[in-house]
């Protein structure tokens, strides 16, 4: 639980609900749970009593925040499969912007270009999917091997994203991480369902330079959090986030 909460804090998920399910064989101390969340600096509401589904639904809706501005389309894909008679279908959520039938899109990384054949939201055919929607995107004209977990769909011609192979970052280390990174350490970066392997080549104070085995796709404007972990770091694998991307 502790590492999960550190991941939430690092991802800046400051608001949420934690529901305590009391089992018949063991009892969970709500005050202890509140202490753990307090130590993680997460101001989530702790729910002790059972809620009706509609009550919990209303609580979740209360967390909804409208995004400002007209962000470009980004759809991180977590599943891909083929449907006979339709073709390649990607499943993901609309992180920003909107996507419509017949839009010309591009798959990043790779730059494969295709056209949206159809869209489904909640198993219903739709003409358009907006930010926050969980969407199935059927594509025409793309190689099935160009789409997979960690792929991102954007509008063709968009300059929203960039691929970096070696970059210098500011490392924002979580206060729970006692281990210190060193040159030649192998780290992993997680963003938008990508999980990339990199090696640290230079350290200068809070700044670190990382060479990635395969390109890391990030937003050009620097928004979007990149979580850095080290899989053999025990007991805490999460180091924090990197920001201020500067390609080498």
Positions of predicted regions on the chain:
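Switch II of P-loop NTPase G domains
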Residues: 1-10
